[in-house]
């Protein structure tokens, strides 16, 4: 069985590389399918997490997004990573993002299996259950960075702007209303037809989610105050593939 797995591995590496490059908009210089991927053992995953500061993890994500948006993702042996991480996990960051199919965090940040915790919900809102998951990721599993990632043209944001009512979705969209109400001074209609308004609400929603995480979790707030973690926000642009990190004031030291 191991022999059969090894025969498929080069094809998986190449297919994954080409797939990510295609998603990112492609560059004129794609990675060669013969490039040798980094093969980390579990100790390497653990070392990377333990020795990284929150600032270094943030820089790692930024560099990964640059590779993705430029169409130059790192080659990966996903079968190897899957086998290695079956014995444990040491993700460096936890990403709270929308369920939108066009915004997968591992691709956007050019990360691999075992590198990120993912918490996904329409509109990337922060509720008690999701914040509890972040507490596990950081306090128990050792992640150094919490990222709230919104994105452009978000359907949940548009729904909140239009005050859509639809079953259980109604209650979820109500949680975005504070962001809608926060946005002032944008010219034009205050609904989904006005994309400038929609994007302003998306950013306000990210800011409020970061604030909400600190309010709901004394654990995470304390860890941030002690520089053990950082909590940041960003917006992913569906058209360019690039992430823009938002300047949000950190918890006072």
Protein language model annotation of sequence segments:
Residues 14-24:
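Bacterial N-terminal signal peptides
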Residues 109-118:
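Short helix-loop-beta junction
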């Amino acid at each position: 069985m191991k022999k059969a797995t090894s025969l498929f591995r080069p094809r998986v590496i190449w297919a994954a590389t080409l797939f990510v490059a295609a998603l990112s908009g492609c560059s004129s210089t794609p990675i060669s399918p013969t490039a040798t991927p980094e093969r980390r053992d579990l100790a390497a995953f653990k070392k990377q997490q333990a020795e990284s500061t929150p600032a270094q993890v943030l820089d790692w994500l930024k560099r990964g997004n640059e590779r993705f948006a430029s169409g130059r993702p790192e080659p990966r042996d996903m079968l190897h990573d899957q086998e290695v991480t079956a014995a444990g996990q040491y993700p460096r960051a936890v990403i709270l993002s929308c369920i939108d199919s066009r915004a997968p965090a591992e691709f956007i940040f050019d990360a691999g299996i075992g590198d990120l915790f993912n918490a996904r919900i329409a509109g990337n809102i922060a509720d008690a259950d999701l914040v509890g998951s972040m507490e596990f990721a950081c306090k128990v599993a050792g992640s150094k960075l919490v990222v709230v990632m919104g994105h452009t043209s978000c359907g949940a944001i548009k729904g909140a702007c239009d005050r859509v009512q639809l079953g259980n979705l109604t209650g979820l969209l109500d949680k975005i209303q504070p962001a809608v109400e926060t946005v002032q001074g944008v010219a034009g209609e205050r609904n989904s037809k006005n994309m400038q308004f929609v994007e302003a609400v998306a950013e306000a929603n990210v800011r409020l989610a970061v604030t909400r995480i600190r309010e709901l979790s004394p654990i995470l707030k304390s860890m941030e105050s002690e520089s053990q973690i950082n909590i940041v926000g960003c917006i992913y642009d569906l058209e360019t593939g690039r992430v823009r990190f938002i300047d949000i004031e950190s918890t006072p030291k």
